[in-house]
């Protein structure tokens, strides 16, 4: 989702293909053997198969609002928190049957403490 959003924001035209993950096309596996999405095949033979890579590449093509002109360390920390511990908590909240020993309200509270409160503090400072 975030790779697609960055491409759209940057005005980069791409051929979008929906992939059924249970039935990955051979053409996709040839360019990206690990078989995960997203995959962006560039004309020069370069293949990007991480959403964050695709985001940075797209913003490198066109960044009309200067999103990349930020404190890189702070931005990286937010992405790492989102992709690591927050994603874990999100999965625990979304799929409670996979985590029967966890209480959803406790997971939600941890997620709020991890992401929402720090975002509010950051926004209040700006």
Predicted regions and their residues:
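GST-like domain detector, emphasizing the conserved glutathione-binding G-site
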Residues: 1-117, 123-125
């Amino acid at each position: 989702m975030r790779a697609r959003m960055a491409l759209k924001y940057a005005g980069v035209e791409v051929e979008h293909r929906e992939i059924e993950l249970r039935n990955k096309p051979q053409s996709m596996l040839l360019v990206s053997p690990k078989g995960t999405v997203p995959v962006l095949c560039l004309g020069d033979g370069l293949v990007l198969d991480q959403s964050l890579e695709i985001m940075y590449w797209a913003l490198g093509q066109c960044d009309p609002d200067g999103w990349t002109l930020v404190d890189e360390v702070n931005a990286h920390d937010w992405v790492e928190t989102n992709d690591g511990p927050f994603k874990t908590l999100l999965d625990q909240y979304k799929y409670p049957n996979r985590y029967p020993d966890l209480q959803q309200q406790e997971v939600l509270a941890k997620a709020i403490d991890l992401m929402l409160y720090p975002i509010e503090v950051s926004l209040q400072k700006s």
